Amino acid sequence: MGKFSGAALAAIVCGAATAASCAWPAQAATSTTAASTATAAACYASSGNLYCGNAANAPIYATPGYTKPNGNPETVVDRLETTFSYFKCYVSGQPHGGGNSIWYHTYGDQTGRWGYVAAVNVWTSTDPYPGVARC
């Protein structure tokens, strides 16, 4: 684990006065290290784009869903190897494990192909994230 405890890290990322009220995504709080949790808390929107922490090796699909209309699996076109990424915009697609149907449009780290990442793999506090453009 990192140099700081969870409480100390919250104070650094969220500001000492607001650390107690800092909202952490459930995925980040339970399944990542303190360092990636800090990244998760650093999501922001700028010019309609999202910059946010995400699951390592998250799959990028050709369309915003896991399956095609005929029931076959959707094609994985690339992956996000990094744990902090750029997302151009969002769309509504198939429901996923995050309890919604928001998918973020981005390009991958392996081949540079564009596609969609399920919001469950992006450490936003709400979906769609405020300030991010709809595709």
What kind of feature is each model-predicted range?
Residues 1-51:
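N-terminal prepro-regions of secreted/extracellular proteins
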Residues 53, 61-63, 81, 107:
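A structural detector for beta-sheet-dominated domains
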Residues 47, 51-56, 76, 85-92:
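A structural signal for short, hydrophobic beta-strand segments that form beta-sheets
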Residues 67-81:
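SH3/SH3-like (including bacterial SH3b) beta-barrel domains
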Residues 34-48, 104-135:
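Boundary regions of SH3-family modules and the immediately adjacent low-complexity/disordered segments
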Residues 78-124:
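SH3/SH3-like beta-barrel superfamily modules
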Residues 57-70:
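Short, structured beta-strand/loop micro-motifs enriched in basic residues and often containing a Trp
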